[in-house]
């Protein structure tokens, strides 16, 4: 399993208590993919630029898609640009992929049996491993989860590459929150105009 998949599992597990913002999760999943691709030697970081290496299969469908979508010509993409491009709809892609491989199921409605409810994790080795990584306070997974709004920042030191990626993830999540707040303010102002205030 990958850090991105473990993060998706942790987020689905957490969603039973408090829903995780999908945009934030998509951005952090894209950051987790960068870190997984770094570990797989599919890319290297030059400052905040992503330089692709020779593609090699990782065994994970979504991670292989991520590696194939790396910009392979100069000027190479920055981590932040990657987060916004790759992150679009990524949380839904991970939920669908987890369901495809049998790690989640959709609960059925009691009154209308054809209607599907929320996505729920099944007991599996992948879920147990993700929970163990989180409980052990694995620094990268903990930092990514914190960026998505799940838990606190890790106390342990991170590698320079991880710090670079996590800083970009944090900036992107803050930018997304600013856009959300601006939209709420604009909508409230528009409503006030219609009410005559």
Regions found by a protein language model. Give the residues of each.
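Short, amphipathic alpha-helical interface elements at domain boundaries
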Residues: 1-85, 192-197
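Residue-level preference for nonpolar/small residues embedded in alpha-helices
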Residues: 29, 89-90, 137
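Short, structured motif recognition centered on aromatic/hydrophobic residues
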Residues: 34-37, 98, 141-146
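Short glycine-centered helix-capping/turn motifs at secondary-structure transition points
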Residues: 41, 102, 148-152
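Accessory beta->alpha helical hairpin/"wing" motif in late/C-terminal subdomains of nucleic-acid enzymes
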Residues: 47-67, 105-138
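Ordered, amphipathic secondary-structure segments that act as subunit-interaction surfaces
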Residues: 73-108
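Glycine-rich, aromatic-bearing surface loops/beta-hairpins
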Residues: 116-197
């Amino acid at each position: 399993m990958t850090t991105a998949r473990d993060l998706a599992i942790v987020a689905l597990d957490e969603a039973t208590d408090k829903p995780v913002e999908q945009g934030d999760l998509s951005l952090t999943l894209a950051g987790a993919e960068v870190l997984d691709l770094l570990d797989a030697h599919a890319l290297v970081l030059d400052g905040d630029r992503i330089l692709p290496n020779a593609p090699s299969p990782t065994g994970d469908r979504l991670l292989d898609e991520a590696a194939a979508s790396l910009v392979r010509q100069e000027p190479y993409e920055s981590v932040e640009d990657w987060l916004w491009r790759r992150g679009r709809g990524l949380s839904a892609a991970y939920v669908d992929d987890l369901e495809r491989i049998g790690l989640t199921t959709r609960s059925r409605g009691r009154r209308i049996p054809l209607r599907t409810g929320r996505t729920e994790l099944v007991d599996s080795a992948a879920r147990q491993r993700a929970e163990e990584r989180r409980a052990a306070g694995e620094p990268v997974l903990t930092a990514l989860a914190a960026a998505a709004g799940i838990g606190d920042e890790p106390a342990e030191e991170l590698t320079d590459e991880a710090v670079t990626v996590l800083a970009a993830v944090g900036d992107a999540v803050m930018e997304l929150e600013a856009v959300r707040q601006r939209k709420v303010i604009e909508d409230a102002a528009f409503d006030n105009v219609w009410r005559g205030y």
